[in-house]
Amino acid sequence: MADQAQDVRPTEWGPGKTPQGRARLPSSRPREKPQLSCNLCRRRKLRCDRQRPCSSCAQRELGLSCTYASDRVLSNGVAHQTRTTTQDRIRHLESLVYDLMQNSSANVNAQDQVGATPSPRGQPRGPDYPTPAAVHAPSTNEEPVSAAVSPADYGSMQSTGGGANYVGSAHWAAVLDGIAELKDHLDNEESHHSDSQGVDPPCPQVTGPQLLYGCPKPADKDEILSSIPARSVVDRLVSRYFNSFEMSPAVLHSVQFLKEYEAFWEDPQTTSPIWLGLLFTIMCLATQFEKSRLDPGVQSPAVLSMERELQEMVDTFRLRIPQCLVLGSYAKGGPFVLETLMLYIAAEIFLSSDAEIEIWILMGNTVQLALHMGYHRDPKHFKGLSPFAAEMRRRIWATIVEMDLGLSAQMGLPRMVKHWQTDTQEPSNLQDSDFDSATVEMPPSRLNTDLTPILYRLVKARLMTTIGYIWDFSADVRPYPYTEVQKMDDKLDLARKSIPECLKWHSMARNITDSPQHIMQKVILETVFYRAKIVLHRKYMFLPLAQSASSRRIVLESALKLLDYQHMLQEETQPFCQLYQERWRVSSLVNHDFLLATSILCYYLQHAWGATQRVSESDSFDETIMASLRRSHDIWLQSSNSSKEARKVVRALAVVLGRVNTPSADSVGEAGLVFGLPSTYPPSTTNDYSQETPGGLGSQFPMFNSALMPNWATFADDLISAPMITPTAEWQEMDETVDAMGSLNWPWNLQ
């Protein structure tokens, strides 16, 4: 008994022990009971009544953010309830947006009654355009029209891992997001739940201009000079650049550059690092042009070896450019800084299959440097500038303004250079041989009928001036009268009519004697014109106004014309065709216009078939649009392997055209079988000599004119095309966005 009494031990007390002697569980152990309170109340340690939304969140006006942990693992039945709740939240958001629209209109009307805002001084030379403030001046009795009729008209905001990406309502991605608005909200919730799990994303690979991230490997001048090829190679690259790139006369004076080029080879060590960076940009662009001349269909060892060698040269030259800029302290400005940055941006554009936000930011830095160096003020205001320097400053500034507008439109953001900030006159139409650094007095400008290398840049700059005002109007958050839209439309038509005959597009049949570069110049002038038409009238397509039918007609006609140009470029950039060697010119900037046209036609079909009041022109016209979209689908499919943007449009088109079983972007070889169409298509209507482009927009569609198109049945077939490989722009991930749209019951489903 004594031995047994000794075996009975008293209950142990102490740290980590319970009164019963069991080990105390660590406080860090997760609770096994389910979380019943909402996430916000749990985080704030508040009492939660477990309602949807709970009273605590409702009192703090956080009802839309009141979520529960159990929402992540819902069954099918409860998932339907969550979707219903999400729809209620969307309706609530729409009501808030509508209230904000009403308040905004009331505030604008109140401001108009006080008085008109005086227009800023310093208007540039050119047509008399109204300033954004002058649009709201009470010069007429017409009330401003609020064109925003849906949340999508405020632009599109996409949340991505580290932040948010915004594009304006005139951007093609915002147009598509307006179609898939519900799915976008669901995707945002899914991404929010994924982020809340605390999974760190992998380190992203740095893309785009390396200059924004600092030189990964700083280099001295000796190392930079050692990477320059032999002079025979550099001579060929410089020649290729000046003979291929139409932007070269607007940035560099060929005669002056040759003098500096010879001085470099005489004594490379005394050459400034910035000029070396300029030389590397020229070689980088020229090497890209040479690489694009290789036939992608030939896979012989010699061709593959040449392709690898050229790509290595491009990578080396691309690395040296930011090293030279940093070594030369480019942020302080100075000679050749703007020229190097502009060509560097051009090289990055051609290298990217998707639009890079870094390129737009680098363009902003270039604009700031140009302002710092006074390029926005005309040289006549300053003494000490030679006639040669003054003319080159005008050329460079005109190109900067054009690049700013083009990249801003591609990103769907307001441009950085405003017309009231500058008074720099346009450059003269002169050959490089007409003046040099020794010129005392500049010769008179040549006539517009004289097709000089700089004429295209001048004509495009004039057209882009008008388009710039239109882009400013589209980015203006204030409403303005529809009469202002009509005025801008008239000015745009006049700007197009002022294009010299030598740069006007008629048809491919009338351009067979032109150089490929000349043909592309004409096409680009046409595409930017029709893009501006869409941007100007898009918001008024479905407004309850008498003018909405006119705007809808202009938008649809412009979109169809843009896709017709896309189809023509697809055909003419094939082997043995006229533009095959110049296919590199179809860059992401050019494709942006085709993306906008594709998206706007999808947007129209959704409204035409889904609206309670029919807004469709006709059933046959809708079939024409779908035929054109089918052909564009095949074209986008070819570039979907290398472009996120193309994948997004391909999936959107698959839904809009009612093809749920569309193959993935990897099935590029099956492009001709996607819609049951043959692999070859009739030629584009843009190639037809009889299909002329009208001088202006008439009251009827050109394709409905019996004189131009007597056989309507054959016209629908003419809008079907084959694929091409083109770089496109990068936007937010939407690989899954359109997938869920396939489950919706689309009224125009063709199956």
From Swiss-Prot:
Its main location: nucleus. GO terms for cellular component: nucleus. It comes from the Eukaryota. It holds the Pfam family Zn_clus. GO terms for biological process: DNA-templated transcription. Residues 38-66 bind DNA. It is found in: Nucleus. Signal peptide: none annotated. SMART domains: Fungal_trans, GAL4. GO terms for molecular function: DNA binding; DNA-binding transcription factor activity, RNA polymerase II-specific; zinc ion binding. Keywords: DNA-binding, Metal-binding, Nucleus, Zinc. The keyword DNA-binding applies. Residues 107-116 have a biased composition (Polar residues). Disruption phenotype: Fairly reduces the production of fusarisetin A. Transcription factor that regulates the expression of the gene cluster that mediates the biosynthesis of fusarisetin A. PANTHER family: UNCHARACTERIZED TRANSCRIPTIONAL REGULATORY PROTEIN, ZN(II)2CYS6 TRANSCRIPTION FACTOR (EUROFUNG). This is Fusarisetin A cluster transcription factor fsa6. It comes from Fusarium sp. (strain FN080326).
